[in-house]
Amino acid sequence: MVRSFHVIARKICTVAVLFIIAIPVFTQEIGVQLYSFRKQLPGNVPVMLEKISKMGIKELEGGGSYGLPPGEFKSLLKKNNLKVVSVGADFQQLAKDPQASVDLAKTYGAKYVVVFWIPHTDVFTIDDAKNAVNVFNSAGKLLKENGIALCYHAHGYEFGAYGKGTLFDYLAENLNPAYANFEMDVFWVKHPGQDPVALLQKYPSRFPLMHLKDRKTGTEGNQKGEADVETNVVLGSGDVGIAAIMKAAKKAGVKHYFIEDESSRSVEQVPRSLAYLASLKQE
């Protein structure tokens, strides 16, 4: 009897260990940034949303309705079990009329508003950064009062040197985390010569959103926010280091992930990227 108990116990432990090993690196849904399908959606929204849903995707980042009335677009989202988690906002509009971003987010039931670009001349300066801090802290306060979180998506020009760090450090240190945080695009951290894992570790809990995008190995980077979209490759096949990033992102508290594939091959590549992410296991 005792021996049988020990045998059963060992089997249970073995199954438990195997179960733990099989747990994916991440448990959150993997969504997609609709910009990935910017060429396929216009005039073809019902078909594309159905195709996206059949990929196993449930979460979207977007904000536009691609020529359809918002109500009709929302009906198609519901039909395909899709929800918009975050919407985009123009920096200048956010500065002048933050309520418009609140209204857009509420239209789609989104919990996040993301700004993707800070207007500047050839070089992003400390004055540009200071202005952005003022705009984001002010607008972010209004958004928070309406149950919406504001994030900024860097594009590489923010990593120019400033003081003992970078202008991104200035943004991170001066944005009130209660009002404004970040969406990390791992491509646009790697492209200007930074380490996405190190940045996640440096600023844990400041990146609730993440764009997953890989870069063709050997691509030359820059700090201008410029890149050939055809250098976007299937996740795991480039030089960004997606596997390590996913582990670090989980520890850093990333809440929502969106594949963004800007290449002309996005319809073919996104399912392959999803398959790669599903293959990742804890060590």
Q: Which residues does each predicted region cover?
A:
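Hydrophobic faces of well-ordered beta-strands that scaffold small-molecule active sites
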Residues: 30-33, 60-62, 84-89, 113-115, ...
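Acidic/histidine-rich catalytic cores of soluble enzymes
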Residues: 145-239
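Conserved, mostly hydrophobic/aromatic
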Residues: 32, 52, 60, 77, ...
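Acidic-and-aromatic substrate-binding clefts and catalytic sites of carbohydrate-active enzymes
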Residues: 38-43, 59-71, 89-97, 120-124, ...
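Bacterial Sec-dependent N-terminal signal peptides
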Residues: 1-29
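Active-site acidic/histidine proton-transfer and metal-coordination neighborhood
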Residues: 50, 58-59, 91-181, 267
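N-terminal pre-domain/capping segments
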Residues: 26-112, 280-283
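C-terminal helical cap(s) of enzyme catalytic domains, especially alpha/beta-barrels
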Residues: 266-283
